[in-house]
């Protein structure tokens, strides 16, 4: 299988940089996969799990939004947050969700709407990790 260069960058770190076979991305308009030779595209990323396949091995990375750009040079993802699932403390993640739920009653209007959307994303990520991310 042909490979291509992939960079995953967050404000804190370069989370991944190297040659890969495929990257599956949680796009705002729907999930999509990138292979070598993919047509150029820029897409908004929604919070979810990004899957990197290289040399037959998969690495799953939680991203909390960002931008993906496919060009002739490869794929670059600028993520708001990027953390490998293997490095994620699931107890802390669950505690964050519980805190978000407890804070909902004090919010109204657009702030409430954004908080509910963010909570839904976190719960979706938690569900994906518990059901598929380690397979």
From Swiss-Prot:
The keyword Cell inner membrane applies. The keyword Cell membrane applies. It is a peripheral membrane protein. InterPro entries: ATP_synth_F1_dsu/esu, ATP_synth_F1_dsu/esu_N, ATPsynth_dsu/esu_N. It is found in: Cell inner membrane. GO terms for molecular function: ATP binding; proton-transporting ATP synthase activity, rotational mechanism. GO terms for cellular component: plasma membrane; proton-transporting ATP synthase complex. Keywords: ATP synthesis, Cell inner membrane, Cell membrane, CF(1), Hydrogen ion transport, Ion transport, Membrane, Transport. Produces ATP from ADP in the presence of a proton gradient across the membrane. Belongs to the ATPase epsilon chain family. F-type ATPases have 2 components, CF(1) - the catalytic core - and CF(0) - the membrane proton channel. CF(1) has five subunits: alpha(3), beta(3), gamma(1), delta(1), epsilon(1). CF(0) has three main subunits: a, b and c. This is ATP synthase epsilon chain. The gene is atpC.
């Amino acid at each position: 299988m042909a490979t291509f260069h992939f960079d995953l960058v967050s404000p804190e770190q370069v989370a991944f940089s190297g040659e890969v076979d495929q990257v599956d991305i949680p796009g705002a308009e729907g999930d999509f996969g990138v292979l070598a030779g993919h047509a150029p595209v820029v897409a908004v990323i929604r919070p979810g799990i990004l899957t990197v396949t290289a040399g037959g091995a998969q690495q799953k990375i939680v991203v909390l939004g960002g931008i993906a750009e496919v060009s002739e040079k490869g794929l670059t993802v600028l993520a708001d947050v990027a953390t490998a699932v293997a490095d994620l403390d699931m107890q802390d993640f669950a505690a964050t969700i519980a805190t978000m739920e407890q804070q909902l009653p004090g919010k109204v209007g657009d702030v409430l709407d954004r908080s509910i959307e963010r909570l839904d994303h976190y719960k979706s990520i938690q569900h994906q990790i518990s059901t598929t991310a380690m397979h």
